[in-house]
Each structure stands twice: as C-alpha cells, then as structure tokens.
C-alpha cells in the first residue's frame, strides 16, 4: 500500500514508481480523478496449495493534513475504515484468509487496550475490533511488532527504513507466527 511519504515527491514520481513496481499496489482510499495512479482496493491471490488469500489496502487519511496541496491535486485520500469495510465485504465468502494492509498504526496498546490516541490518524485497533481480518500488516509508527494479537487478528509492523522485515507463517491449524528478520546485503 502507499504510505504518507510516498506523496512527498509529487504525483509524477509516485506514478513512475508504481508503474515500475513489479507488484500490484492496493490502496483503496486513494482516488485519482485523472486515472494515472495504478492502485486497486483489494485482490484475491490463490497460493500454490490452493489457499485463497484476500488482501485489502489502505493508508492513513492524515495525508490530507500533512502533504503539500500541489502533491495531492486531483487526488483524494478518503476514510481508510470505510475502504476496509468495503473490501472486507467484497472478499466475504471468497477467501480463506482475509488480510488488511494498512499504512497506519495502533491507537491502543495491544496488550491492555489502553488508548494511546484519540485521533483517527491510526486506526489499526478499530480495524481489528470491527472487521474479520485474520492478519493486519501495519506501518507508519515504525515500531517493530511481531506475534501480537488483538481481537483475534494477528498484527505486525516493521521498523523504519527497511532495517528489518516481518516474515509471517500460517500453520495448517490456522495459527500465525511472525518474526522480525534483518535483510542481508550481497554484492552484485
């Protein structure tokens, strides 16, 4: 999905990046009036073993507050919760594993449920409380988070600047395990 800093360099740079990406970008709450940004809302991916995984992507709407207006001209960044609801409904009964990909963080402590923020900048906990995601991949707060569960959803987040990534494994009994791994650089 897209993060707030993906908009910092203007739409031409963002469009070039997305067109060169060897993947499909899912960010359903970003709308482009000109139709240049190649982003979708959700997709279904069937693994080699036949398991159907549904992916729904969204980003924090606070991009509207932080980004330069010229970088958002012709774009709208809507409510990520509304996008997640629409995506979850579209995937219902079509997939075995619904996954949310959200560039936003947790508004509550996952262990205690204690509120950390009253704003809607970060709504990961609300997504877990209200929607049937089995896995929620989060970002934005840059807090390393693995093997966390909130309201039945496995929640992960990577630290900043790609210093580590999260490997998530789903076992045959439907249980998730996640671990933080460090990328290895190799000379080319």
Residue ranges and their predicted role:
Residues 1-187:
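Acidic, metal/ion-coordinating pockets
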